[in-house]
Amino acid sequence: GSLEIAHYPDVARQIAQRFKNINQVAITLRESISATHNNWGAMLYDVHSDTAVFAPMNGEQYEPYEIRNIVDRVGGGDSFAAGLIYAMTTKDFATAQDQVDFAVAASCLAHSVKGDFNFNSRAEVEALANGNVSGRVQR
């Protein structure tokens, strides 16, 4: 079914209230259409500024990647976490929006390879994050 993304910042606030030492909350947003067709995105919430950013965006509107013909869902979350950690620790990704954009693109592409290791290059991830905003991934 459809996700009500407007509620996810509230979920992140509840997590932050329970775990006082965290600065950010990241949540992946998966809409399962079928076993091989998912819509995929994420939210990154900053505790101190009480702001949330979503990815991918089409202008000001959240528009999840439409992943058809999923090869393997295993590793999608790990790939998101790895992409987010990489982006947060690399000076090229200065904003929370840049960071979550990269992480979501990395995890989206991970759905196109077998197993839980993301073989995609940084250039491939950035091409998706910066390129086709229609939300359709073709591999």
What name fits each language-model region?
Residues 1-139:
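Conserved phosphate-binding/catalytic region of the ribokinase-like
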